[in-house]
């Protein structure tokens, strides 16, 4: 255990700060069980706070018992434990493994503050499995880099201190100090790809080539280094392409070679937190979205959003609710919560300083998101026009036109938030504030 602790300490020394807090991702399995022991010892020696987070997926009938076991083990060490219960969304077409992993990291993300270190228990055998799964998918250097030992995560960093340690060494240490841990029965189910590799493939590879795991780790490191070098070389180009609104300039992108263009698209999606696209998806982004006809409104659906085009720039747009049917009355000086994360809107009385004249029946004011069939006459325009045309003139992207609040009086447009006030309602009684 001392040798393992020495290795653990060396990894953490590179990342520890004066106000660092250790957060252990604690499933209760043997890897995280040993990790908890190491983190507790390190925290005591360096006078650091240490806590644990257990994610309850609800996939096993033993899950509640695992929570009790984890709570007992943390209590023995006086380590605070938080239990996060998650619901898996299996409608997206992802495997149960992938959805569980995504839900787990999303739950952990909420617990990581500035300078925190999230410690996870992946080891060298996990790295081999990840590498082989990436190879099966036909991944390039990015995917074959597998898992990084440390990386930014939420407001802190994610550290995998055991990534260079074989599973058998972790189990040997656990037995040596008399630890108990939970066993996930699904780990024996070879219908899952990772379990198939673990149970049937890796033992044969390791028996034939004992240094196979170390060789895979070396290859993964080389792939990561090549990918990092490519990022470094293309960063000046990427910074020219990338806009303040997180869009990408199509004209400048078209001046790059196809290889550079695809890499820059990957860098863009990675910066926005989107999973790595396939080569086919990259080709579709370029051919069907970037190069579509000037009057087209192209859309390419990805796993976590849509790629859209506007004013010769590419945008990654989140999948949003259809708000066409949403409407609500608005009361003076009372913030109105808007749906789908669009913030609040408030009509504030400010006599003599406002932009809108109050109609006689202010109780007939309401908010809508549906511009269909509506017209308005902005004060600075010569005549009335359909809202569809006005949105185009005011350079509002098509996907935001049904997400921009419209202030209505009966069936008349009073104002469009952030754009204009209809000339019929120009005055100084009140102002419309949209806080996104």
UniProtKB/Swiss-Prot annotation:
Transmembrane segments: none annotated. The keyword Chloroplast does not apply. ATP binds at residues 27-32. Keywords: ATP-binding, Cytoplasm, Ligase, Nucleotide-binding, tRNA processing. One of its GO terms (cellular component) is cytoplasm. It is found in: Cytoplasm. It is an enzyme of class 6 (ligase). One of its GO terms (molecular function) is tRNA(Ile)-lysidine synthase activity. GO terms for biological process: tRNA modification. Gene3D superfamilies: 1.20.59.20, HUPs. Its main location: cytoplasm. It comes from the Bacteria. The keyword Repressor does not apply. It catalyses: cytidine(34) in tRNA(Ile2) + L-lysine + ATP = lysidine(34) in tRNA(Ile2) + AMP + diphosphate + H(+). Pfam families: ATP_bind_3, TilS, TilS_C. Its EC number is 6.3.4.19. Belongs to the tRNA(Ile)-lysidine synthase family. PANTHER family: TRNA(ILE)-LYSIDINE SYNTHASE-RELATED. Ligates lysine onto the cytidine present at position 34 of the AUA codon-specific tRNA(Ile) that contains the anticodon CAU, in an ATP-dependent manner. Cytidine is converted to lysidine, thus changing the amino acid specificity of the tRNA from methionine to isoleucine. The N-terminal region contains the highly conserved SGGXDS motif, predicted to be a P-loop motif involved in ATP binding. This is tRNA(Ile)-lysidine synthase. It comes from Vibrio vulnificus (strain CMCP6). The lineage of its organism: Bacteria, Pseudomonadati, Pseudomonadota, Gammaproteobacteria, Vibrionales. The gene is tilS.
